[in-house]
């Protein structure tokens, strides 16, 4: 559960309505793979990830980034039940993929950076603060099934 004030919830929802999920998703996942290259080990089947340009131009990275942000959108629609919303993904990432849950925090922070880049002055400090709460809540929900 994420505790947002009505103003924060409104700010998150208003900005998210303007997000191009295809573009932002691919950019966020691509940046994660470039900035934190050890995360690439989970995406070996994606082909060439040898350079920043290869990562950022990789169609599989873009497609998976879109999928990730689709799940994030679901979370925004269920802020009062993030653990329930992400239970299946938490299990998958824990039991099958063995993803270090710290990576969820990294991706959340990268997403905030990408949103700031895309929205500039519209991404005010209060909007950022609200998004930081949301990405922390999502990361916590995704880590819920870890033992």
From Swiss-Prot:
The modification S-nitrosocysteine is found at residue 94. Keywords: Acetylation, Heme, Iron, Metal-binding, Oxygen transport, Phosphoprotein, S-nitrosylation, Transport. One of its GO terms (biological process) is renal absorption. GO terms for cellular component: extracellular space; haptoglobin-hemoglobin complex; hemoglobin complex. Red blood cells. The keyword DNA-binding does not apply. The keyword Transport applies. The modification Phosphothreonine is found at residue 13. Pfam families: Globin. InterPro entries: Globin, Globin-like_sf, Globin/Proto, Hemoglobin_b, Hemoglobin_oxygen_transport. The modification N6-acetyllysine is found at residues 60, 83, 145. One of its GO terms (molecular function) is oxygen binding. Residues 3-147 form the Globin domain. Heterotetramer of two alpha chains and two beta chains. Involved in oxygen transport from the lung to the various peripheral tissues. Belongs to the globin family. This is Hemoglobin subunit beta. It comes from Gorilla gorilla gorilla (Western lowland gorilla).
């Amino acid at each position: 559960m994420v505790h947002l004030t009505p103003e924060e919830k409104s700010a998150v929802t208003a900005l998210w309505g303007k997000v191009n999920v295809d573009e932002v998703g691919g950019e966020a996942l691509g940046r994660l793979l470039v900035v934190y290259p050890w995360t690439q080990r989970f995406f070996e089947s994606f082909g060439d990830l040898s350079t920043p340009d290869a990562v950022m131009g990789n169609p599989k990275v873009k497609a998976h980034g879109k999928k990730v942000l689709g799940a994030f959108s679901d979370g925004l629609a269920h802020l009062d039940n993030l653990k329930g919303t992400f239970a299946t993904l938490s299990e998958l990432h824990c039991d099958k993929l063995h993803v270090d849950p710290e990576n969820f925090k990294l991706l959340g922070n990268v997403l905030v950076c990408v949103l700031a880049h895309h929205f500039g002055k519209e991404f005010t400090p209060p909007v950022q603060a609200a998004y930081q709460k949301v990405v922390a809540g999502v990361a916590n929900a995704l880590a819920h099934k870890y033992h």
